[in-house]
Amino acid sequence: MVMVRDIFHEPVLVNEVVAFLVRKPGIYVDGTLGGGGHSSAMLRALFDAGFLAGSLLIGIDQDDAALRVAGETLKEFAASTVLVKGNFCDMGGLIASICAEKGLEPKVMGILLDLGVSSFQINTPDRGFSYLREGPLDMRMDSNASRSAADIVNGYDEQELARLFYRYGEEPRSRSIARAIVAYRQKHGAVTYTQELAAIIRGNAHGGEKVIKTLSRVFQALRIEVNAELDVLRQALYDGIDCLDETGRMAIISYHSLEDRIVKRVFAEKARSDWGPKGVGLREPLSWGSVAPVTRKPLIAAPDEIALNSRARSAKLRVIEKIHEGGRRASE
């Protein structure tokens, strides 16, 4: 079998994730299992600390290939793991179902989400995620999902495409690129391959590094739309926080500003107590914040890690902890 590190990316900020999440026995959830790199490190840390016997790791991924590889990676810890196909936005139901089967209370000690597309998906031409490789214009993280990138590129009108590229790609040339795609469709028919779309984009972008940035932004926008990534992320953050046990933690690794903005806002919202309208002068808030930040600012990878793993360059890690009602973090 090909080594996991050869087909899936090396786990980003893995030492920091383990240090923040693994502190006691309990249920741990890796909602973006991938090749199992982060999960393997967490399970090893649980074992080394003597916590493994009282712990369970639930790994969730939409990708059948990821689940197969992760199963091989984690076979040493098979008795302490449950791997399940699903979307992390459904983690609440998945956790409840698995815990019910095992007679466990569905209270989680640690949740990890490592967002974005995996290197394996990027490097597999048939998945259609990369503008560098010829393949069908697909971009579905779940290969059984109904809508592909080709459906969007060929089904949206010019205004819808422009809005998409600007909203999810923050692309300044969104209108001209959308116009060029529609013109191409009218002349040549449907756009069905990644290199076909890349050629259209290159013809409507400035030279040099700006072309690469434009390609990245447009492909990012399509991937987000195909997989409803930002809506899924919001749902997962709310559900995940609800699943946390008291003192349980959630760690999120994001890779672009749209993701990080959502994580920051949801964490801030859940940490905020509601004191009602100004001037009321309540002795206690109407409702207490349910989490507290563990990282006041997002953590980034050290230069040494970036040198070894370029994907770490844009990674940001934010961590929160479930707190007592009206209290501070139990660890403080």
Swiss-Prot record:
It is found in: Cytoplasm. Its EC number is 2.1.1.199. It catalyses: cytidine(1402) in 16S rRNA + S-adenosyl-L-methionine = N(4)-methylcytidine(1402) in 16S rRNA + S-adenosyl-L-homocysteine + H(+). S-adenosyl-L-methionine binds at residues 36-38, 61, 88, 114, 121. GO terms for cellular component: cytoplasm. InterPro entries: RsmH, SAM-dep_MeTrfase_MraW_recog, SAM-dependent_MTases_sf. Its main location: cytoplasm. It is an enzyme of class 2 (transferase). SUPFAM superfamilies: Putative methyltransferase TM0872, insert domain, S-adenosyl-L-methionine-dependent methyltransferases. One of its GO terms (biological process) is rRNA base methylation. Keywords: Cytoplasm, Methyltransferase, rRNA processing, S-adenosyl-L-methionine, Transferase. GO terms for molecular function: rRNA (cytosine-N4-)-methyltransferase activity. HAMAP family: 16SrRNA_methyltr_H. Belongs to the methyltransferase superfamily. RsmH family. Specifically methylates the N4 position of cytidine in position 1402 (C1402) of 16S rRNA. This is Ribosomal RNA small subunit methyltransferase H. It comes from Pelodictyon phaeoclathratiforme (strain DSM 5477 / BU-1). The lineage of its organism: Bacteria, Pseudomonadati, Chlorobiota, Chlorobiia, Chlorobiales. The gene is rsmH.
